[in-house]
Amino acid sequence: MQLDKYTAKKIVKRAMKIIHHSVNVMDHDGVIIASGNSTRLNQRHTGAVLALRENRVVEIDQALAQKWNFEAQPGINLPIHYLGKNIGVVGISGEPTQVKQYAELVKMTAELIVEQQALLEQESWHRRYKEEFILQLLHCNLNWKEMEQQAKFFSFDLNKSRVVVLIKLLNPALDNLQNLINYLEQSEFAQDVAILSLDQVVVLKTWQNSTVLSAQMKTLLPADYSKQDYKIAVGACLNLPLFEQLPLSFQSAQSTLSYGLKHHPRKGIYVFDEHRLPVLLAGLSHSWQGNELIKPLSPLFSEENAILYKTLQQYFLSNCDLYLTAEKLFVHPNTLRYRLNKIEQITGLFFNKIDDKLTLYLGTLLEH
């Protein structure tokens, strides 16, 4: 590990709060990279060079400082060790007899901060590479051998069935995203997390059953989140090997989210199992088969027939219940009958024929 300016500044700030003397931190070349006296930055410190070369504490009094042409100020300089190696020097400015009492305390403070920073970097590295592993699983970019090797490294059990959950932030910001990630990665949740974008996060939940998953969704996000902050989409849980299961669960979660945002914008959670048919049909929307299916309905997509198309949608949303549909549309049942007859005339499809009725229904589900 190399001592960087960020860590050096933390050492100076923490040490000077304790001892109220100016503190300098020098890198492995003896150059001052952080100091309580900003005018000394980027200067080569002779005492630090000597401390590094000989791996010892170097005390500089007024006479020695003068001998060195004040390339170093009076003070005491101690090597900073990490894993048995010298990575820099911490120096306390002042007469050695006055500041010597603080030397070991400052050295210990510096080395603790270095160890803490190294641990944070390791955790950051581990998180970043595990996130990359998860994303590769979702996009099916690994062969079986690579998957086994990386799964073993990250203690990722390939035998556990999982379901993909997508979280979409409606007010994305870097702070919001980081706070959410910190919450989701708490060990008590036992789940894997990856960032897709500034406004989307993916969570892998171990699949037990739909009842357990439903209960987990209630605590998926922090308690202070409101429905105005997010949307959640739960993908399919498929009885397949994990390398097939996760990409398909991810795709179904994406399709479920797209469908939910368009057709149920007021809801906060969209579950694949609750919207199975329209989500599975999503792949047909822009295919030649899909175009053929909706071709008879194309006149209904015009602005002048918008009310008829809305009526058709509500009719199927109401499970073909004539009176419930009329109630939802705030019209008389006879008005509804007139509209349904009009739809039959325009499309040439009839509600009392099963194939025609299915075509009409699919036409309300497919994108156009």
UniProtKB/Swiss-Prot annotation:
Highest taxon above the source species: Bacteria
InterPro entries for the chain: CdaR-like_regulators (IPR051448), CdaR_GGDEF (IPR041522), Diacid_rec (IPR008599), PucR_C-HTH_dom (IPR025736), PucR_C-HTH_sf (IPR042070)
Gene Ontology MF annotations: DNA-binding transcription factor activity
GO biological process: positive regulation of DNA-templated transcription
Recorded family membership: Belongs to the CdaR family.
Protein name, entry field: Uncharacterized protein HI_0093
Organism lineage: Bacteria, Pseudomonadati, Pseudomonadota, Gammaproteobacteria, Pasteurellales
